[in-house]
Amino acid sequence: VKACRLENGEIDWTGLDVYIGVDLAETTDNCAVVMVAYVDGVVYCEPLAFIPEARTDEKSATERVDYRHFIKQMQCVACGDRVVDYAVIEEYVMKIEEQYGVKIIDIGYDRRNAMSSAQKWERAGYNVTEVEQHSRTLHAPTKLLKECILNHQFLYKANELYEINYQNAKCTEDTNKNKYVNKKRSAGKVDMVVATIIAVYIMQQHEIFDTGLDWGIQTA
């Protein structure tokens, strides 16, 4: 993924339609919000991680990741005490349009930990879509993301923490050869990758398939 890194300067997001992917995980763990846009066949990406502030040094030691450095680099936000403060994440998402000059088309989320936040965004007037965390749903955006990266059709501002997430990520195949990032089998934190895949899924539905959101609930 490093080959897709924008070494100097910023991505100009002004006027773009964007899609937000949210992985809130557990409140004691890392969370991530990722914004993507699809422009002339290229996926633009802006990731941000969130961690519990009081666990910053503990996580840095156990994960061998210098979170204080990444906080200074504005690649990570420390909030809350020993659990992530979801209110900080909710407010960040609701300020994206003003901060970047974009139009949020849809916000994708995993229902396990984000139902309350999604309801708040919906009440604030945003479109929100639950993205099922199942291989049959995640295979297509995972495949598209991989292809965009390999073809250098993916662009993000230099972000070492984001790259570490990719190094940690391990893909698994189900019995139907559907590939997805498996958190349990990954070597470390992959929340920013998962949030990217959620955002790409939403983007794919609107920009590429344009057939409406169609997904099923896994009951077993």
Residue spans for each PLM region:
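RNase H-like, metal-dependent nuclease domains and their acidic two-metal-ion catalytic environment used
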Residues: 1-133, 139, 143, 156-220
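Short, surface-exposed amphipathic charged segments that create phosphate/polyanion-binding patches used
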Residues: 142-151
